[in-house]
Regions:
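Hydrophobic targeting segments
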Residues: 3-10, 26, 38-44
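Conserved catalytic core of nucleotide-sugar-dependent glycosyltransferases
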Residues: 122-224
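Active-site acidic Asp-centered loop
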Residues: 47, 115-118, 148
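C-terminal catalytic/acceptor-binding lobe
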Residues: 196-289
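Short beta-strand/loop segment that forms part of the nucleotide-sugar
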Residues: 36-51, 86-88
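Short beta-strand-to-loop acidic/aromatic patch adjacent to the donor-nucleotide binding site
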Residues: 108-120
Length: 289
């Protein structure tokens, strides 16, 4: 790879049961790269201002040790990737972390990728993004990029839906069909869609529209002012989208229509070991961070 990347992920302590799947998908995307031009960033947040740990079933120190064990294999890959981890005790949200991540690495790398604990990163991620950046960096050094997503709840998301998903029906509360927003997909299932791709289907999405999971932005766009406003605590992707439209409304958003990124929003283990939250039927009803 000729392009330098950074990919960053905030892990809340109660997400410890799902982050391994994200790490496995990330490892898969790195195993066959020719060099180690990827910085892998993690912040493991142990702050309990919003959610308290149920110490009758888990201890915070144990979760920290588990996280360190999960991340360790990334440091031992043949290419010896630059893995940067920290344990955070202060109050932060995803907006705080992503704002810092974009600002911190925009002067060190060419392209930034937003990871997420409930995401599965396509194994083609860095290969296709490297190809894209090398082709467009002279003519459009400031750009956004996105991957195909599952079937969404209204037609405003159709430009982002994966080609195999977009013509499927949206069924409210559906957890059984593979295209559904509530379906929890495995890495192997994701690979079945992506491994069959022979020719990339790339379009320019206008106006900009994206969610934060797997969102890609060139460092030149960040350095020009596209970042999450400091007054934003949640809904960071919407805020970042507004800033992109305000600051650089004409930059392209290159969208890979036939490369699937998985966002397991309703993963059954997304919120574990939280005091007083033993039976959460609908995650977002009680989600605070």
């Amino acid at each position: 790879m000729k392009t330098k990347f950074a990919i960053g992920c905030l892990v809340q302590w109660y997400e410890i049961e799902i982050v391994q799947e994200y790490i496995d998908s990330l490892k898969q995307s790195l195993e066959h790269q020719e060099n180690n031009n990827v910085i892998i960033d993690f912040t493991f947040n142990i702050n309990q201002q919003l959610e308290k740990i149920d110490e009758s079933v888990a201890k915070l120190d144990e979760l920290v040790d588990r996280f360190k064990t999960m991340v360790s294999p990334l440091k031992k890959l043949v290419k010896k990737y630059d893995v940067r981890c920290r344990i955070n005790e202060d109050f932060i949200t995803i907006a705080h972390y992503r704002r810092w991540f974009l600002d911190e690495y925009c002067t060190e790398v060419d392209v930034l990728v937003q990871g997420e604990t409930d995401a599965l990163i396509p194994k083609q991620t860095f290969t296709v993004l490297d190809m894209l950046h090398q082709q467009v960096k002279k003519d459009t050094p400031k750009y956004l990029a996105t991957f195909g997503i599952n079937k969404m709840w209204d037609d405003s998301w159709k430009p982002l839906e994966h080609v195999d998903f977009t013509n499927k029906p949206f069924i409210n509360d559906d957890e059984d069909n593979w295209w559904s927003i509530r379906y929890t997909m495995t890495i192997d299932e994701m690979n079945q869609f992506n491994d069959k791709v022979e020719d990339l289907d790339i379009v320019n999405v206008k106006p900009h529209k994206f969610n934060g999971c797997g969102f890609v932005i060139s460092s030149e766009a960040v350095k020009s002012g596209v970042n999450i406003p400091k007054g934003t605590f949640f809904i960071d992707d919407t805020a970042l989208g507004h800033m992109a439209q305000k600051v650089l409304p004409d930059i392209p958003q290159y969208h890979f229509r036939n490369i699937l990124i998985v966002h397991n929003r309703k993963h059954s283990k997304k919120r574990s070991w939280i005091l007083g939250e033993n039976d959460v039927n609908y995650i977002d009803d009680k989600r605070k961070s």
